Design a protein with these regions (language model features):
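Active-site-adjacent segment of 2-oxoglutarate/Fe(II) JmjC oxygenases
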Residues: 245-305, 428-483
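Glycine- and acidic-residue-biased ligand/ion/polar-headgroup-sensing regions
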Residues: 185-188, 193-215, 366-397, 407
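Intrinsically disordered, low-complexity regions enriched in proline, serine, glycine
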Residues: 191-193, 210-212, 219-220, 241, ...
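Intrinsic, low-complexity N-terminal interaction/targeting segments
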Residues: 160-162, 166-170, 177-180, 189, ...
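A short, N-terminal "cap"/entry segment at the start of jelly-roll beta-barrel domains
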Residues: 26-175, 279-361, 371, 462-495
Length: 495
């Protein structure tokens, strides 16, 4: 009896061991499953495919794990250097990767090849970021935003689009923001107003602007390419493209400005009870049955009369004119010519209503440069309308960075940070330089050197007399240069 009981106990124990014994199974040798985030059976880790996670045997030292089949070096036969790229990095030749096979981050004896992964289009657009001159040092506030990377708001009926730059994408640009907007022929920018002050310049086509201020003064004007307008905070206004459409750049004096936060007349009507609208406008309730049920922002419109006077409605305060005018026809202002290009200045001196908006529209010929300078009291917000350029920004005490710019890029340089703009292409650079200041001013480094006692300069920088004697006591703004950008590759000569 005892023996039978013992046999039954042993049998039960054997069965229990069989139930709880863990089973280990290896994937079948013929399995062709690929490693990835999920197997062919979804997220089922119990399938016979490779597991989502590896085993503990992969931790730490694994013998014979290296493979000689993947090299981080790009063979010399697979790339070429751009003209001027092999020159001493201290010279900082402004070379281009435009026609270079497989560009590499090499300058003189600095750098090494890059096997990727890479986006070659970025490298070609930014040779001085990819292979910077040796004068670059430390960290500098990010100074570039390509508008081509801004999200584009496109409107129904092919009426237009809008994209913007603000501190969301360029965090250091705290004093100003930009909006690039396009209106199709006869399309409107909806009646609106802003908390920020608005300065605008026409980039393409032509536009009719209309506004009314607190004193009941009205204003209507037609603007062409290069012309400017300004609307103070709170002044309601509208824009209508004329027959060829219009694109314009808007600059606002708030770095965190968003055009999505604009006050719109459609939204204002929607956010008031119809009873209130009826009482305020002394109109029957049914007159408000057709108001839009959503904002319009940009909308197609009826062609405007050719004569702007037909849409000029004098108010109790009359029509704004003279120093109260909201527009300035910069396209008709003669440019100040220099051997290297030209400059037009528009600030409250000649456009009084734009009290703290001072700008320079600068043209730089190939090989020339906007001289090294800084602005003492204002950050500089810039927009490149044409051409290719590079800018080196020096931020005290020891930081410097060189950045490439092309048409459609926005630049931003902090107050007192020195910088220049050098044309690195074969066409003119056209650049808008914007300040928050009552007058457009800058500090010219060359002028400073000339107007400082020579011995102080010689003792400090060890510059020769011939250099100091050749400097002008006047600002040059745009300095002529050699169109052959690689002329100094040998280490001698004048740029």
């Amino acid at each position: 009896m005892v023996r039978q009981s013992m046999l039954r106990l042993c049998l039960h124990i054997s069965l229990l061991i069989g139930v709880f014994q863990p089973t280990y199974a290896l994937p079948h040798a013929s399995s062709s499953a690929l490693y990835g985030w999920a197997s062919a059976n979804g997220n089922d880790e119990s399938s016979q495919l490779a597991p989502l996670r590896g085993s503990s045997t992969l931790l730490g030292v694994v013998q014979d794990e290296l493979s000689s089949g993947n090299s981080a070096e790009v063979p010399q036969s697979a790339y070429e250097l751009a003209p001027g790229q092999a020159a001493d990095a201290d010279i900082g030749i402004p070379f281009t990767f435009k026609d270079t096979q497989n560009p590499q981050p090499i300058r003189g004896d600095l750098g090494s090849t890059d096997p990727g992964p890479r986006t070659y289009a970025y490298d070609r657009l930014n040779p001085n970021t990819f292979a910077p001159p040796s004068s670059d040092n430390g960290e500098v506030t990010q100074s570039k935003w390509p508008l081509g990377l801004s999200h584009n708001r496109i409107l129904p009926g092919h009426a237009g689009w809008s994209r913007q730059e603000n501190t969301d994408v360029l965090p250091g640009a705290t004093a100003m923001a930009g909006v690039d907007m396009k209106l199709a022929p006869w399309a409107y920018r909806e009646l609106h107003w802003h908390q920020a002050n608005e300065w605008g310049i026409v980039l393409n086509g032509s536009v009719r602007v209309q506004a009314m201020n607190e004193d009941g003064q009205t204003f209507t004007d037609d603007l062409d390419v290069g012309d400017v307008w300004y609307f103070p905070s709170g002044v309601p206004h509208s824009l209508q493209a004329l027959g060829l459409g219009s694109e314009f750049m808007l600059v606002f004096d708030q770095g965190n400005f968003s055009d999505g936060g604009t006050g719109l007349i459609t939204e204002m009507f929607l956010r008031n009870p119809k009873e209130v609208l009826s009482k305020n406008l002394q109109a029957p309730l049914e007159d408000f049955d057709e108001i839009p049920q959503d904002q319009l922002y940009i909308l197609n419109g009826t062609p405007a009369p050719k004569d702007v006077k037909e849409q000029t409605i004098p108010g109790p305060g009359g029509v704004a004119s003279g120093n109260d005018s909201y527009t300035y026809h910069l396209s008709k202002q003669a440019a100040y010519e220099t051997p290297g290009g030209s400059i037009k200045i528009i600030d409250p001196v000649n456009f009084p209503i734009a009290k703290m908006f001072s700008a320079a529209l600068v043209t730089i010929k190939p090989g020339a440069m906007r001289e090294i300078h800084w602005h003492g009291t204002s950050d500089e917000w810039g927009f490149f309308l044409a051409g290719n350029a590079r800018v080196s920004v020096y931020e005290a005490p020891t930081s410097g960075a060189t950045v490439d710019f092309s048409a459609g890029d926005i630049s931003y340089v902090k107050a007192t940070a020195s910088h220049y703009i050098e044309n690195t292409g074969d066409e003119d650079v056209v650049f808008l330089e914007m300040l928050q200041a009552p007058r457009f001013t800058d500090i010219s480094v060359a002028q400073w050197l000339k107007l400082t006692p020579k011995q102080i300069i010689k003792d400090t920088l060890h510059l020769p007399d011939r250099l100091l004697d050749n400097l002008s006591p006047n600002k040059q703004y745009v300095i002529q240069g050699n169109r052959n950008l690689t002329a100094l590759s040998s280490g001698s000569g004048i740029a």
